[in-house]
Amino acid sequence: AHNLMSYRHTRAHNSLLVNGIGQPYSTEGYGSVMRAMGGQHISYCLGDASYAYRGISNDPMWVGYFKQAGIEQVPENGFGATPLTKYRRHVLMLHPHTVIVYDELEASEVVRWEWLLHSPTEFKIDATKKTLSTNNKTKGLVAVTQLFGGHVFTLSQTDRFVVPHTIT
């Protein structure tokens, strides 16, 4: 169950959930790279995931895995249709240490957007400045993320999986 609900699910990949729903495990939900360029000082990529959140997984292999795990592909489990109409992600890297992610998001109705950002170390959250920072002392890496948006949003973190990992 952990493999389907956490490891493979959109929620595990620094992406968005729309009303708690991620992408299906299906070729019917897809994305594409619209633009890409790389240079000595700057790199850029534009991805379009507008069609990536399209219903449930209907591939017989995945249907079998869900059945075997006793998991229904319903919104409460993060699967189903969404009113998403536009999801374009711009990623700009100013070499060597700055990455800017800008998402263009639209839906046909009011939705709850969730951006799930992952780190092997705990985030320090400053809700006033809308920043998250993390320091991985083992690897010698520091990351600071500042969030901008046109709507009020909340910041939170957890160290829990939707379905805990079990060793069998």
Residues of each region from the PLM?
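CBM-like, beta-strand-rich accessory domains located in the C-terminal region of large
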Residues: H2-T168
